[in-house]
């Protein structure tokens, strides 16, 4: 499609609802950006932390500013930037901050929350429940909850680096 005129940056989103922490694994928005990055294109996934807001103007403005920054600060092939914008007016957003840690997803505490679209479709989302104390203070979820637009660098490589026991399987 774009063989001779590839984009300088692929922006996936703006997603309705956050893509923070372990939820990134399930996100079509994040994974569309991941596909672009694996094809060698710089990519940015953008999400608004609201399932009900219809005003994307603040998220769009912040996405544009982060996109301009991302073009000047490229990541290696196979990596992407993941932006999450709080659902706040611009004058209440504290700024844009890098989040080195993704909030963990504790499936033992998880629950499903439902959301009904304007077309009366019901969607279910796996959430971490009501346990923000379990998240590190500098994690994407905590920073975003406090009013920061957060940017995380993600990679497709989710391999466990340490802790896998030696394979001893007889055939």
Regions flagged by a language model, labelled:
Residues 1-7:
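Glycine-rich phosphate-binding loop signature in dinucleotide/nucleotide-binding domains
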Residues 16-19, 50-51:
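A short, flexible beta-alpha/helix-coil linker loop
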Residues 18-27:
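Glycine/threonine-rich flexible loop motifs
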Residues 37-59:
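Glycine-rich phosphate/pyrophosphate-binding loops
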Residues 58-171:
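Electrostatically charged, flexible surface regions
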């Amino acid at each position: 499609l774009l063989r001779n005129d590839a984009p300088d940056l692929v922006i996936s989103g703006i997603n309705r609802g956050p893509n923070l922490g372990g939820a990134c694994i399930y996100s079509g928005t994040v994974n569309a950006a991941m596909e672009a990055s694996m094809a060698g294109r710089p990519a940015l996934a953008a999400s608004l932390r609201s399932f009900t807001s219809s005003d994307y103007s603040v998220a769009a403005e912040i996405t544009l500013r982060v996109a301009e920054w991302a073009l000047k600060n490229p990541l290696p092939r196979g990596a992407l930037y993941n932006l999450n914008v709080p659902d706040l007016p611009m004058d209440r957003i504290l700024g844009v901050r890098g989040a080195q840690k993704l909030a963990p997803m504790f499936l033992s505490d998880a629950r499903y929350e439902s959301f009904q679209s304007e077309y009366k479709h019901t969607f279910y989302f796996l959430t971490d429940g009501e346990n923000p104390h379990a998240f590190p203070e500098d994690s994407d979820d905590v920073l975003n909850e406090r009013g920061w637009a957060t940017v995380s660098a993600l990679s497709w490589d989710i391999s466990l680096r340490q802790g896998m026991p030696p394979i001893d399987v007889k055939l």
